[in-house]
């Protein structure tokens, strides 16, 4: 009995010794965690700095404009760009099925002629992946090669990622709508802003991970059975 215990002690000491396999595994695991934390933190700092420094480009031009719904300012900005000739047609992607073209026209104070000829309403998208798939179909239908993308600056990186994944042959030009909370130079001391930034970064990382693994990526489109009244895209008259 005593001899068995004496024999077991060296075996345990061998596992936990400075060069034992368990110690090597623990050290390797800790090192891996430190590296991953460093990569994650560095990525977040890059993301936050990039988002906070985004500005609308001067002289932007494209074949057409796409705006991803989510706020009045985005749509108003996109309609203004269409009015200014930045693109010759506008897709409003992710419109609520209960919202009409007339309601959006009145909200943005756009002209009836412009909305009738040049504004298409996308009703199928329910998330950013859906926006990208809805946009890719619209781009193919119109044979466009360059698109000005209008969305919130928090949302721009993930939007461009999904759009380029769905339509890799298209050139996408970012036209961010600047959030008021990021217009201030000291946004990084405001917990709510940092929380939003971190949340968007996590969603951006998840989107990249889905593309790498192919796991958990749906089409993001509203099913016809769920809403028979919602057309795929309500096209303006040519």
Which sequence ranges carry the predicted segments?
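N-terminal type II signal-anchor transmembrane helix
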Residues: 13-55
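A structural signal for short, hydrophobic/glycine-enriched beta-strand patches
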Residues: 2, 48-191, 198
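N-terminal intrinsically disordered, acidic low-complexity segments at the extreme N-terminus
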Residues: 1-12
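Short linear elements at protein peripheries
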Residues: 62, 214-238
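Coil-to-alpha-helix initiation sites in intrinsically disordered, low-complexity, charged segments
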Residues: 13-16, 20, 185-186, 192, ...
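A transmembrane-helix-recognition feature enriched in membrane-embedded lipid enzymes
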Residues: 190, 194-220
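Short alpha-helical segments used as structural interaction elements across diverse proteins
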Residues: 20-24, 71, 200
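Structural signature of transmembrane alpha-helix termini at the membrane-water interface
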Residues: 42-49, 78, 205, 209-212
């Amino acid at each position: 009995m005593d001899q068995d215990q004496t024999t077991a002690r060296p075996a345990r000491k061998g596992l936990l010794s400075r060069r034992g396999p368990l110690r090597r595994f623990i050290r390797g695991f800790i090192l891996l965690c430190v590296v991953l934390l460093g990569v994650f933190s560095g990525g977040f700092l890059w993301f936050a700095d990039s988002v906070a420094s985004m500005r609308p480009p001067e002289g932007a031009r494209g074949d057409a404009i796409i705006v991803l719904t989510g706020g009045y300012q985005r749509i108003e900005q996109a309609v203004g760009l269409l009015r200014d000739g930045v693109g010759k047609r506008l897709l409003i992607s992710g419109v609520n099925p209960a919202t009409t073209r007339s309601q959006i026209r009145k909200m943005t104070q756009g002209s009836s002629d412009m909305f009738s000829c040049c504004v298409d309403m996308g009703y199928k998208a329910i998330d950013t992946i859906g926006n990208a798939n809805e946009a890719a179909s619209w781009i193919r239908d119109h044979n466009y090669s360059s698109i000005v993308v209008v969305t919130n600056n928090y949302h721009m990186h993930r939007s461009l990622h999904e759009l380029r994944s769905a339509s890799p042959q298209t050139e996408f030009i970012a036209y961010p709508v600047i959030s008021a909370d990021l217009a201030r130079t000291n946004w990084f001391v405001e917990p709510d802003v940092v929380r939003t930034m971190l949340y968007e970064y996590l969603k951006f990382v998840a989107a990249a991970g889905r593309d790498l693994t192919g796991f958990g990526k749906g089409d993001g489109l509203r099913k016809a059975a769920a809403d028979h009244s919602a057309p795929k895209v309500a096209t303006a008259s040519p």
